[in-house]
Amino acid sequence: RLAHYGLKYRQKILLYGSPGCGKTMGAERIAWNTGLPLVKVRFDAMVSSYLGETATNLREVFETAAADPCLLFIDECDALAKSREDAQEVGEIKRVVNTFLQLLDEYEVTNGLLIAATNLTKFLDEAVWRRFDDVIEVPKPTDLEIRTILKQTLAAVEVGSVDWDTIVHRLNGFSAAQIVKIAQNAAKRAILDREDLVIQEHLEASIKDVIVSHAG
């Protein structure tokens, strides 16, 4: 099925873009479309204060992913490079980065994919960049994508009268994560209002809440 979507076997992809732009959603969608189980790990959570364990943790993740074909998704992959700013840990961090590079070189799972994501490209080690077959920017959602995200998020609830063109226009420039949150909050508002349908007013109020929270 990978070939059907124009993806090579053993392909390694790096996604980059601003926070919340939809990198994780993109990886999840690829996993769903290709039928591959998703193995997801965050590097910022893996790199603990005791860095001596990090290389071991890395190997365990890659061993798990290599056991069966899957989509290995590595989020916040810049976390290792960012940690090098701490001069007291430079030696250990270099060892961890070298381990990661070695694991990327060795990662060969038939019909599997490896996707990494980062918000901070300037902090990512150049040697890491070179390990990926494709480097793809994930921009803010287009109007069509905004509409799709809204309708998919609200698919499990009844939706009443909504001027989608107006809502989409208001959400232009919002991140995918913000759009999902707005749709979810609109559904919660409908429940609190004891309404059977999510309507225009619920979405408008949710948009206003996000704008106000960011302004504060």
Language model segments and positions:
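C-terminal alpha-helical "lid" subdomain
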Residues: 143-216
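Walker A/P-loop NTP-binding motif of AAA+ ATPase domains
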Residues: 1-165
